[in-house]
Amino acid sequence: MKLTKFVFFFVTIFSGSLCAAEIQGNVIRVLDGDTIEVKTLPAKIVVYEVPIRVRLINIDAPEKKQPFGRWSTSQLKTLVAGKQVTVSYSHKDRYGRIIGHVFTTNGTDASRFMVQSGAAWVYERYNVDESLPALQREAQEQKRGLWADANPVPPWEWRYKHN
């Protein structure tokens, strides 16, 4: 009986993190350097489809009005706009956006691409990918993208000052 209670408790507590979902679709809009809209691929059952808003996990890109904001958006557009992607996720944020790993058909992880090219920061507060800080350091050392700026301001600081 105690074992049954323990198993039930374990499954209840950790089920949210164990249940991952996946969607496939075409990117119909790139809103900024870390947010896209995906239209899911047609299913066998016809349903009313709405675009699904997805925020790339582990990163924070410059805001549109921030230095490098438009450039960051264009980097993500080059990678995924109009293309098929697979999104793997386990939760949504407070705005209802899926927070997920976005992969192109050739396997490129959009979050890693954005950090490696200097188009986004590792979002240290929420990052769970231990390899991303090294990619960011490499981008900084090579002065790629936003790291070409002498004093780039992280988006979370920029939002605090401008909102």
List where the protein language model places each region.
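Small beta-barrel nucleic-acid-binding modules, primarily SNase/OB-fold domains
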Residues: K2-F8, S17-N163
